[in-house]
């Protein structure tokens, strides 16, 4: 790994965020460093980067057919790394704005779909034959709207959820694996389904020393989650995240049945998902 890649990777990690955010940022940093190396540009640290280096990388990615949304995300990563390195002026420069780079204006409409119940049960059955603990995590992701990392780390919260449900709680606390490490509360939209999923997971974890996915670290557990779910059929428009899309639709219906307007239901669901109440329009577009 080049000195620039090492420097950018260190800054990418230091900038914080979820496991996936940091991982994606580190991968982008290595691609960027390889691009400069291939162009024989002698830059060894982030402090030496110039706007033309960044523009050249984005233009090459455009020529490769990479989507505008992906490149917008990559530029957000570049800016966070620059800011972490103290290069705030460059990170906010008009020279590397999305518009200047020709990557503005992409639609935020979702490219994935909510998983249909029939497909979900097929996948759940396949996964159960492979690993009951993985199936339990998958089931909790569907009935609670958990992100992948939240589902993988949920074994640490099973007893808490069981106690909260026993006390009649309408909302459950999601603490581990959340994006940016920000705890959130999620609405119980189907009490019996959630109660049953938590009980099943507790029984399995009780036989596995408290674990659902028995891997030595988070990275290998996440790889196990993604690889086996892909093999079981969660791929393309029905990615593992389609479980969360399906839960979001359930939540919107639940809130509307409670008397909330559509706009209020979107805002409440956005909060449950960990996006905040100001992103109702985003939820409607993406979910």
Give residue spans per PLM region.
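N-terminal core-binding DNA-recognition domain of tyrosine recombinases/integrases
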Residues: 9-108
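Short, basic interhelical loop/turn and adjoining N-cap
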Residues: 159-162, 274-282
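Basic, Lys/Arg- and aromatic-enriched nucleic-acid-binding interface segment
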Residues: 117-148
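Conserved tyrosine-mediated DNA breakage-rejoining catalytic core shared by Y-recombinases
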Residues: 153-194
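DNA breakage-rejoining catalytic core of tyrosine-based enzymes
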Residues: 104-122, 180-192
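C-terminal catalytic core of tyrosine-transesterase DNA break-rejoin enzymes
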Residues: 139, 244-277
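Short, leucine-enriched amphipathic alpha-helices that occur as contiguous helical runs
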Residues: 25, 120, 133-135, 222, ...
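Active-site/catalytic core of tyrosine-dependent DNA strand-transfer enzymes
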Residues: 189-251
């Amino acid at each position: 790994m080049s000195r620039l890649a090492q420097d950018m990777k260190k800054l990418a990690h230091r900038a914080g965020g979820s496991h996936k955010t940091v991982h994606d940022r580190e991968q982008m940093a290595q691609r960027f460093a390889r691009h400069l190396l291939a162009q024989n540009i002698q830059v060894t640290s982030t402090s030496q980067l110039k706007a033309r280096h960044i523009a050249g990388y984005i233009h090459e990615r455009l020529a490769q057919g990479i989507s505008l949304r992906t490149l917008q995300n990559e530029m957000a990563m570049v800016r966070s790394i620059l800011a972490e390195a103290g290069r705030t002026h460059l990170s906010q420069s008009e020279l590397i704005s999305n518009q200047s780079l020709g990557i503005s204006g992409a639609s935020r409409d979702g490219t994935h779909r909510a998983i249909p119940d029939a497909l979900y049960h097929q996948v759940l059955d396949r996964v159960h034959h492979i690993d009951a603990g993985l199936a339990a995590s998958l089931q909790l992701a569907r009935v609670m709207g958990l992100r992948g990392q939240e589902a993988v780390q949920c074994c640490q919260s099973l007893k808490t959820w069981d106690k909260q449900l026993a006390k009649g709680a309408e909302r459950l606390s999601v603490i581990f694996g959340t994006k940016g490490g920000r705890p959130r509360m999620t609405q119980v939209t189907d009490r019996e389904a959630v109660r049953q999923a938590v009980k099943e997971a507790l029984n399995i974890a009780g036989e596995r020393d408290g674990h659902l996915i028995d891997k030595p670290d988070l990275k290998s557990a996440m790889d196990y989650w993604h690889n086996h779910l892909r093999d079981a059929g969660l791929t393309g428009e029905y990615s593992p995240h389609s479980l969360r899309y399906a839960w979001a639709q359930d939540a919107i219906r639940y809130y509307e049945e409670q008397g909330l307007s559509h706009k209020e239901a979107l805002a409440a669901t956005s909060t449950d998902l960990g996006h905040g109440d100001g992103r109702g329009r985003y939820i409607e577009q993406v979910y």
